[in-house]
Amino acid sequence: MKAFSPVRSVRKSSLTEHSLGIARSKTPVDDPMSLLYNMNDCYSKLKELVPSIPQNKKVSKMEILQHVIDYILDLQLTLDSHPSIVSLHHLPRVGGNTSRTPLTPLNTDISILSLQAAEFSSEFTDESKSLCP
């Protein structure tokens, strides 16, 4: 029977884990930390793009999303009130229906959004909570 030293077996298993870790991290879907960093990058990009978000102040993800929603609504109002667009609305459409109904009603009440976020976060498992700050 051949005996192995504990140092050698630890080294052997760490190499195996290391090589498996490299193989596993090839796709972003398999690496939750990569997904988290990608989401944080997206929030940073949104913060840069929306002019009403203060750039020199730390804002929460919920605040960023609220600013984005408000900005989109402002852009929609601006487009709807633009003279060239208004004149297009008075032309009959080929489809017959002149107004578009939203797929779902927009919720602009931040207190309700905060409550929904609290309910959503309670559904996370302990493992997923450790991934999200």
Curated annotation (Swiss-Prot):
Keywords: Biological rhythms, Cytoplasm, Developmental protein, Nucleus, Repressor, Transcription, Transcription regulation. It comes from the Eukaryota. In the embryo, expressed in a range of tissues, with primary expression in the developing pronephros; expressed in the pronephric anlage, and by the swimming tadpole stages expressed robustly in the pronephric tubules and weakly in the pronephric duct. Expressed in the secondary heart field. In the developing nervous system, expressed in the neural crest and in the neural folds during neurula stages, and at stage 20 in the neural tube, ventral mesoderm and mid-hindbrain boundary. By early tailbud stages, expressed in the neural tube, somites and branchial arches. GO terms for biological process: cellular senescence; circadian regulation of gene expression; embryonic digestive tract morphogenesis; endodermal digestive tract morphogenesis; myotube cell development; negative regulation of gene expression; negative regulation of transcription by RNA polymerase II; neuron differentiation. The keyword Nucleus applies. A motif (Nuclear export signal) lies at residues 106-115. Induction: May be induced by Notch signaling. Its main location: cytoplasm. It is found in: Cytoplasm; Nucleus. One of its GO terms (molecular function) is bHLH transcription factor binding. The keyword Transcription regulation applies. One of its GO terms (cellular component) is nucleus. PROSITE patterns: BHLH. Signal peptide: none annotated. Residues 23-75 form the bHLH domain. SMART domains: HLH (SM00353). PANTHER family: DNA-BINDING PROTEIN INHIBITOR, DNA-BINDING PROTEIN INHIBITOR ID-2. Heterodimer with other HLH proteins. Transcriptional regulator (lacking a basic DNA binding domain) which negatively regulates the basic helix-loop-helix (bHLH) transcription factors by forming heterodimers and inhibiting their DNA binding and transcriptional activity. Inhibits the activity of both neurogenic (neurod1/neuroD) and myogenic (myod1/myoD) bHLH factors. May play a role in the regulation of the circadian clock. This is DNA-binding protein inhibitor ID-2-A. It comes from Xenopus laevis (African clawed frog).
